[in-house]
From Swiss-Prot:
SMART domains: rADc
Disulfide bridges in this chain: none
Reactions performed catalytically: adenosine(1518)/adenosine(1519) in 16S rRNA + 4 S-adenosyl-L-methionine = N(6)-dimethyladenosine(1518)/N(6)-dimethyladenosine(1519) in 16S rRNA + 4 S-adenosyl-L-homocysteine + 4 H(+)
One GO molecular-function entry: 16S rRNA (adenine(1518)-N(6)/adenine(1519)-N(6))-dimethyltransferase activity
Annotated function: Specifically dimethylates two adjacent adenosines (A1518 and A1519) in the loop of a conserved hairpin near the 3'-end of 16S rRNA in the 30S particle. May play a critical role in biogenesis of 30S subunits.
Homology family: Belongs to the class I-like SAM-binding methyltransferase superfamily. rRNA adenine N(6)-methyltransferase family. RsmA subfamily.
Designated name of the protein: Ribosomal RNA small subunit methyltransferase A
Primary location recorded for the protein, binned into one broad class: cytoplasm
Keywords: Cytoplasm, Methyltransferase, RNA-binding, rRNA processing, S-adenosyl-L-methionine, Transferase
Length: 270
């Protein structure tokens, strides 16, 4: 097994249980065309290849790419791209290999330090969702981030990230993956989480306004919502709206669920 490199935040997943849970979460079919981000040593890649039509793997580390080519290069449904997933245009890079496109599912064990930009790359933002979207995304990420993504209103983990991700996708927490499942063990635990991108045709009428509201609403968690939003919405008008949807005028941002945020945005963006 190659030695993990700190500069790439590499931690090799070695738990058979975790690998199997990732594969089960992906609900694979023989017609699936996968994108795997950061295949590393190929431990998951080898299990995925027999189950799908094709797999494009993107790996930044040149040395790992050489090892992957040596071990998996003869697989006719495997395409390896060397580069930074945040900078690569997969469709352009793989256009001469039509059987690998379009990608319909993503599986990734991603470095913790690029979780946010990876989510932007795969799902987009409220104001600019990724189109066309994937059918399913399976990520192994930091447990704390996964808990924030699936958090419910009023809980300590509920925040802007929760609302944004739940707006863009149906998010499902699959399982915990303890730090001992990796070599070397990271400092924190991980979790497997899935995203099924939503159809957004009947959501916010002004997504950019909704995104602005959410960011402002959570800019000071201890303040009441009407104080955080006063630069956009008159306090009295907001109080009137909150009363109409059976919320106290002293509510904070974390008390509103996704549908209430959408209703708030649609009402005041007219």
């Amino acid at each position: 097994m190659p030695q993990p490199r700190k500069r790439f935040a590499q931690h090799w997943l070695r738990s058979e249980t975790a690998l199997e849970q990732i594969i089960q979460a992906a609900n694979l079919k023989k017609s699936d065309r996968l994108l795997e981000i950061g295949p590393g040593t190929g431990i998951l890649t080898r299990r995925l290849l027999p189950l799908v039509q094709s797999l494009i793997a993107v790996e930044l580390d040149w040395d790992l790419c050489k090892k992957l080519v040596k071990s998996l290069g003869d697989e006719d449904n495997f395409l390896l791209l060397q580069g930074d997933i945040l900078k690569l245009d997969i469709a352009t890079e793989a256009q001469q290999f039509p059987k690998f496109l379009p990608i319909n599912k993503v599986v990734a064990n991603i470095p913790y330090n690029i979780t946010s930009p990876i989510l932007d790359k795969l799902l987009g933002r409220i104001s600019s969702p990724k189109q066309p979207s994937y059918d399913l995304i399976v990520l192994l990420i930091q447990k704390e981030v996964a808990q924030r993504i699936i958090a419910y209103p009023g809980s300590k983990n509920y925040g802007a990230l929760s609302i944004k991700m739940q707006y863009l996708a149906d998010c499902n927490y699959i399982c915990d993956v303890p730090k001992k499942s990796f070599y070397p063990p990271p400092k924190v635990d991980s979790a497997v989480i899935t995203f099924r991108p939503r159809s957004l045709l009947n959501s916010a009428t002004n997504p950019k306004y909704l995104e602005t509201l959410i960011n402002l609403g959570f800019s000071s968690r201890r303040k009441m919502l009407r104080n955080n939003l006063q630069s956009l919405i008159d306090r009295d008008l907001l109080t009137e709206f909150l009363t109409e949807i059976d919320l106290n005028e002293q509510v904070r941002a974390e008390n509103l669920d996704l549908n209430q945020w959408i209703a708030l945005s649609n009402y005041f963006s007219q």
